[in-house]
């Protein structure tokens, strides 16, 4: 005779050993963000976007997707360059020391709606500088 004994909620959904190292890492990341301050991070991202977005919008052959007002933009800029596949743009930028993501970014319905096969996506965070932009 076999029988099962079910634990009470929420423990019955725990399978095996909890990710202890992950929990410790998450706590350290939260401490790091609290030390810097989320408002400081947001202001830093906005400073970079306010600098770079207008420059990209003025570049011939570059299409920037998203709000044109830097104040309404997040720390991510998606773009395409006429006549060059985004994967090729990403490869060329990588060769110059710039890391961007190219592809559909798990948003295929949006790419179909935009009528593009993919975009390049540059993202900025607290460790990026204006000089890098």
Regions found by a protein language model. Give the residues of each.
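Pyridoxal 5′-phosphate
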Residues: 1-133
